Amino acid sequence: MPLQPSGLFKTLRDVLPRDAAITMDAGTLCLQATDALNYWQPKSLFTPLDFGLVGFSFACGLGVKLAAPDRPVVSLMGDGGFGMTVSELSTAVDHGINTVTVV
């Protein structure tokens, strides 16, 4: 049974702490998430300017985590966006950058 976006967003709303930072790629899922999730603090939502940049979210999430190591970071993206930046996974491992990635 596939996971429905509304279920994913509800789960994220229930478990994410108020200081969580969320990064997003382009795409329908991420557009829906901008309305469905809570952003409690300034600088909590990181998106490409016009939601037209695929592959932004994962690398952005790594940067956010480096800038704010104590904040939980969740990166939302589709399979295409992750495929475009999967090479950054080795960067995250090599430097111990721990984020949550939802593809």
Regions found by a protein language model. Give the residues of each.
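Active-site diphosphate/adenylate-binding microenvironment
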Residues: 1-59, 64
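Conserved thiamine diphosphate
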Residues: 67-103
